[in-house]
Amino acid sequence: AAINKNIRISSSFSSQNTIKYKNQKISLTKYNIKNDPVYIVRNKTLEYLGKKNTLSINIESNIPRGSGLGSSSALCVATAASVASLFNTKLDRKTLFDLAMYGEKKIHGNPSGIDVATSIMGGLVSFRKGYDPKRINLKHNPELIVSISGKRRKTSNMINKFTNLRNEKPYSFRS
């Protein structure tokens, strides 16, 4: 399910590639960082568009990092959409998903894609890896309470734990 938090990204033409993060607690500028997921998504989007421009990307987020609320996927989706928008291009959902997944793979290793799909579609999403995600429309929207414990977690660690458990006890995962 999507939450009412967001990331705003603005892209502009620049003499050098820059990525500037500004959120609740950090203000950071990164120059030419090849392993940064934003840089990776930026490059893949430019490649898809057939462009080779240098860009400045400014990021503002009110999604708490490391809280399990999908901040990395929102970041990757917003980056691809922002870069494409700079060239007056609106990406279809599939292309946006594919471009954002490059960054998610850098961050999480082997993500399912549910966070990217939810960031793109919003609301409640039915997702199964390898199949098209579907938006679930309910007659009445449930109210959810999300509590942040203050403990940061790495999604990639949780993915690895889940994968190991599924490999050790595959019978537990059959429906």
Write out the residue ranges for each language-model feature.
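Secondary-structure boundary/capping motif
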Residues: 67-68, 154
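C-terminal nucleotide
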Residues: 8-47, 51, 87-89, 98-108, ...
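DPxDG-like acidic metal-binding loop motif
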Residues: 3-5, 69-93
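Short pre-catalytic strand/loop immediately N-terminal to key active-site residues, enriched for Gly-Thr
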Residues: 55, 60-67
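A short, compositionally biased micro-patch
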Residues: 2-4, 12-14, 62
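Short, solvent-exposed loop/turn segments at secondary-structure boundaries
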Residues: 30-32, 68-71
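Generic structural signal for well-ordered secondary structure
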Residues: 2, 34-38, 76
